[in-house]
């Protein structure tokens, strides 16, 4: 599972997930990409399950890049514990996603295979996504 090796602080405030993805919104490594259309959070488990779906579908052909990393800790209090007595322990890690953020990239496969693979991966994610191709400038 993806998570930072070490952080300056163990816990973070909830914060806001506003705006559009300015960084990481272009296809930079591969030929085809899966881009988010909606805003939300991706947990490390969701990122990993989508990656597995991608790699299983393309088999050995092609190279895959994961363009998101879960770097925000989400804390949770244990069940049946009263309120107060401090913030809960870190339960899992998330990546905050804005509309326009490229999530996965792939190259070395046909467009048809890439579309099928991204459709399988998108089914594992809680966000609306779209298929994009690299534009040559």
Curated annotation (Swiss-Prot):
One of its GO terms (cellular component) is cytosolic large ribosomal subunit. Keywords: Ribonucleoprotein, Ribosomal protein, RNA-binding, rRNA-binding, tRNA-binding. GO terms for biological process: translation. GO terms for molecular function: rRNA binding; structural constituent of ribosome; tRNA binding. The keyword Cytoplasm does not apply. It comes from the Bacteria. CDD domains: Ribosomal_L16_L10e. Signal peptide: none annotated. Belongs to the universal ribosomal protein uL16 family. HAMAP family: Ribosomal_uL16 (MF_01342). Binds 23S rRNA and is also seen to make contacts with the A and possibly P site tRNAs. Part of the 50S ribosomal subunit. PANTHER family: 50S/60S RIBOSOMAL PROTEIN L16, LARGE RIBOSOMAL SUBUNIT PROTEIN UL16M. This is Large ribosomal subunit protein uL16. The lineage of its organism: Bacteria, Pseudomonadati, Pseudomonadota, Gammaproteobacteria, Pseudomonadales.
């Amino acid at each position: 599972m993806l998570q930072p090796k070490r952080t300056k602080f163990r816990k973070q405030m909830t914060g806001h997930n506003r705006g559009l993805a300015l960084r990481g919104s272009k296809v930079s490594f591969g030929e085809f990409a899966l881009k988010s259309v909606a805003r939300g959070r991706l947990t490390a488990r969701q990122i990993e399950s989508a990656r597995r779906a991608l790699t299983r579908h393309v088999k050995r052909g092609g190279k895959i890049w994961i363009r998101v990393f879960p770097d925000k800790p989400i804390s949770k209090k244990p069940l049946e514990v009263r309120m107060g007595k401090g913030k809960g322990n870190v339960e899992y890690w998330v990546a905050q996603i804005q509309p326009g953020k490229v999530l996965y990239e792939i190259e070395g496969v046909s467009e048809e295979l890439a579309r099928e693979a991204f459709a399988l991966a998108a089914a594992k994610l809680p966000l609306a996504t779209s298929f994009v191709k690299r534009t040559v400038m």
